[in-house]
Each structure stands twice: as structure tokens, then as C-alpha cells.
Design a protein with these regions (language model features):
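Signature of multi-pass transmembrane helix bundles
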Residues: 1-52, 93-292, 296, 302-304, ...
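Mid-membrane cores of alpha-helical transmembrane segments in multi-pass membrane proteins
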Residues: 71-77, 97-103, 123-129, 150-154, ...
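Hydrophobic alpha-helical bundle architecture
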Residues: 111-115, 294-373
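Solvent-exposed, non-transmembrane amphipathic alpha-helical segments
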Residues: 56, 60, 68, 80, ...
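C-terminal TM-helix exit segments that contain a strictly Trp-centered aromatic cap at the helix terminus
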Residues: 53-61, 370-379
């Protein structure tokens, strides 16, 4: 069983998701050709996203490291990026069976009416395995604690996916879709709180500028493409590169800003037919009861506000991280994942660039402290995995500790981590919160 699921994970999202979507399409009554085409569109989307992400990391890692060296921005925690966190997640006893265990929990929640989300985003299950793996090592390699932490994270993420589904679907015009990805969902509470605070500030509501408004106000300078070129060139200039390389970095960042929306359109092309068929099936067979298909946030990271906020925050957070009291983490490798901060913020800010930027900055600053706090046990887990498997993704350079924005900067991950550190008292508190969330969600589902 363990080898089967390890093999499935090794296929990667670009192969795994087309197979899953083709099977789902056939199960809900789509013709084979249409189901296969939908699945392949999703797979091509993941391939394209991988190419663009590689374009960003390959070309910007060295300039960002050069900036760090030139201006003496070295901090003690080495940014290993999400691949290290995923390596820690899947190279432990917890990660080996995380998919069947979480699918089982999902099934039980569906039949007990404590969720409406069917989480088919199997690739992102590594997030649950990661917090489980950290708990596993914190508690002296206890599988009980590892699976407890993973399941608590999974259940609360499913509930949050349900709670945000209507707002998400309305804002992005994606019927029947929810986002059960804990990294994205953990920014949702910040979006709710700060959005309400902004509305209480006299005159703040007048700063209602979305990405389209930015274009009207600043003309071509408000375009994500042009903003990307400017920020990319500024990074090259700060790294003291020659004019040729500065221009190349500018065009490369601009290309990333332009290509991501086109690639995410492929996800929508693949998902739309399956989503529509699912809603049709639910209406005819299940008396109109709602069912949400849990998907990756990659589906919506091409939104113009997400692109604008991400490209502006990359240099800003790099500068702030150095001078932040008590912070030991300098985000470099993780910056390519900046786009994933915003999918669950935008439905609450309604795409307002100013609100989104401020919320994104605040959550990132808090996230840096979360990463710093989790560093000792992230390092312990990574070292144990590297010693056992030799996986280079988990190798921490000499003289450094290890960390990553995704998933160590997440509110969900940090709260569970801190709960585990409190031992059985923390377990009790986490269990009560989780059960309460399930009860609240069930009451909503039964009422509707």
C-alpha cells in the first residue's frame, strides 16, 4: 500500500491530475473523449506552471543571493523552499500513508455532513504530511502525534474550504469549486479581520483600486507585464549586474506576469466541463445538495491583483526581513511561491490592490516569525530525512538552520505546531477546536 501511494505521488501533479480528472469525468457521466480532454487541460496547466516557476527560480535565485551577499543581508535560517518541506513531508512514516488516511477522513466527513468538499487536490496533501512529520519528530517519532497533527490540519482546512466556497465561487466565477489548501486558507482569517478594520477607517473605502483601476490611473505602468519588467530590472540593478542581464531579468519577470494568467486559463478550460457536469448530477440525483470539488489554488493565481501584489511584495519583504527584530529567516527560494498568498484574500478585499497589498505584507511579516519559531524542529526533521534518505532537497548547508515560507509561515501550521509542543494539553485544545469547527459546519450544511 505504501509503495502504491509513493508511486502515485512520484508521478507529480502534471501526470496525476489528468488521470484523476479523467476518472472523475467518466464517473459523473462524461464521454471519454471530453473527460480525457478536461484532464489533459489540467495537466498541461500544471506543466506550464512548472515551466514558469522554473523560469522565475532559475533566473532570479542567483541575483537575489548576490543582493544578499553584496549588502550583507545574511540571516541564520536558510530558505530551502517548498521542495524541502515536501521532501520532509513524504519521506517519513506519516507521509507514506497520508493520502489514503486523508481520503478516509474526507469520506467520513461527507457522510456525517461535516463537509461538502471532495478534496481531489492530492498533490497538495504534502502540506498535511509536513505538519504531521514535524509533530512526529517533535514528539520523538510518535506516529500518533504525527497523524493527529495531519488530520487536525486536514479537517480544519476542509471546513474553511466550505466556509469560503460561496465567496470564492462568486468572486472568481467558478461554480462548484473550493480551495482546501491549508497554506492559502490560513491567510483567510487575516483577510477577514483586516478587511473589517479597513472598512472602519474613515476615507479608506475611497481607495477602491483594483487591477483595472490601476491601469486606468497609471496607464501602461499599471499593467502587471510592465510592473514585472520594472521590478525584474530593479532586482538586476540591485545585484550590480551588467545592462544586458538587467534587461534580461526585466523581460523575464514581465514574461512570468504575462504567462501565468494564460496558463491558469488552461485549468479553467479543464475544470469547467467537470464542474458543470457535477452540478448537473447533484441537482438530478441528490436533490440539489451542494458538493464542492476541492482544487489547487493554482487555478486562480493568474488574477491581475494577485500578480500586481506579488511582484511588488517580492522586493519589499526581502528588505523588511533583514531589519525585522527577532527574525532570522531571509526568504529567497520561497519568493517564487508568493502568488499563493492571495487566492483566499482577494474574495474578501474584492480585488482592492491597496487592501490586498497591506494584508499580504502583514501576513508575510507575521509568517517570518512563524518560520523563525519553527526553525529548530524544521531543521531537526530535515536533518533526519536527509540522513535516512540522502534526498538533497532536505539538505541544509553547513552553518545554517532550515526553513521555508510554504508551509512553515502558515497560521494553521504554526498553531498546530505550538499545540503539539504543549503535549496533551495542546492535543486537547486542538481537538476541541476541530470538533467545534465540524459542528459549526454541519449546522450550516443541515440548515441549507
Amino acid at each position: 500500500m505504501e509503495q502504491v501511494f509513493s508511486y502515485i505521488i512520484s508521478l507529480g501533479a502534471s501526470v496525476m491530475m489528468p488521470i484523476i480528472f479523467t476518472v472523475i469525468g467518466l464517473c459523473i457521466g462524461m464521454k471519454f473523449g471530453k473527460a480525457l480532454k478536461s484532464g489533459l487541460f489540467v495537466g498541461v496547466g500544471f506543466v506550464g506552471l512548472g515551466v514558469v516557476t522554473a523560469l522565475l527560480t532559475t533566473n532570479f535565485n542567483d541575483p537575489l543571493k548576490a543582493i544578499s551577499d553584496i549588502y550583507h543581508l545574511q540571516l541564520n535560517v536558510f530558505d530551502m523552499g517548498w521542495p524541502a518541506a515536501a521532501a520532509v513531508a513524504y519521506n517519513t512514516a506519516v507521509g507514506a500513508l497520508i493520502i489514503p488516511i486523508c481520503l478516509g477522513v474526507n469520506f467520513l466527513m461527507l457522510i456525517t455532513k461535516t463537509t461538502r468538499t471532495v478534496n481531489i487536490d492530492l498533490w497538495n496533501y504534502w502540506h498535511f504530511a509536513f505538519i504531521g512529520a514535524v509533530a512526529y519528530f517533535v514528539m520523538d517519532q510518535s506516529l500518533l502525534w504525527g497523524y493527529f497533527a495531519a488530520i487536525v490540519c486536514y479537517i480544519n482546512t476542509l471546513v474553511c474550504a466550505d466556509l469560503t466556497a460561496d465567496r470564492f465561487q462568486k468572486y472568481y466565477d467558478l461554480d462548484g469549486i473550493s480551495i482546501p489548501q491549508p497554506f492559502c486558507q490560513s491567510f483567510m482569517p487575516f483577510a477577514i479581520v483586516f478587511n473589517k478594520l479597513f472598512d472602519m477607517i474613515p476615507g479608506f473605502s475611497k481607495l477602491d483600486i483594483d487591477a483595472e483601476g490601476l491601469k486606468k490611473k497609471f496607464g501602461v505602468l499599471g499593467e502587471p507585464l510592465v510592473l514585472g519588467v520594472i521590478v525584474g530590472a530593479l532586482i538586476g540593478w540591485a545585484a550590480q549586474l551588467d545592462i544586458k542581464k538587467i534587461l534580461f531579468l526585466g523581460v523575464t519577470m514581465g514574461a512570468v506576469m504575462e504567462l501565468i494568467p494564460r496558463i491558469t486559463a488552461l485549468f479553467i478550460d479543464g475544470l469547467k466541463p467537470i464542474s458543470e457536469k457535477t452540478q448537473e448530477l447533484v441537482k438530478t440525483k441528490f436533490n440539489g445538495k451542494k458538493v464542492h470539488i476541492g482544487m489547487s489554488p493554482a487555478l486562480v493565481i493568474g488574477h491581475p491583483t494577485t500578480l500586481v501584489a506579488s511582484v511588488i511584495l517580492i522586493p519589499v519583504i526581502l528588505a523588511i526581513a533583514v531589519f525585522l527584530p527577532g527574525n532570522q529567516f531571509l526568504p529567497l527560494a520561497s519568493l517564487a511561491g508568493m502568488f499563493y498568498l492571495f487566492p483566499m484574500i482577494l474574495p474578501f478585499t474584492r480585488g482592492n490592490v491597496v487592501k490586498t497589498l497591506i494584508i499580504g505584507l502583514v501576513t508575510l511579516v507575521i509568517g517570518l516569525y512563524f518560520v523563525t519559531d519553527m526553525t529548530p524542529d524544521f531543521t531537526l526533521a530535515a536533518n533526519q530525512v536527509y540522513a535516512a534518505t540522502g534526498d538533497n532537497a532536505a539538505h541544509i548547508p553547513d552553518g545554517f538552520s532550515g526553513g521555508a515560507l510554504d508551509f512553515a509561515s502558515s497560521l494553521f501550521g504554526w498553531v498546530i505546531y505550538r499545540g503539539v509542543k504543549l503535549s496533551y494539553v495542546g492535543m486537547g485544545v486542538l481537538a476541541v477546536i476541530t470538533v467545534a469547527m465540524m459542528v459549526i459546519n454541519r449546522q450550516r450544511i443541515v440548515k441549507e
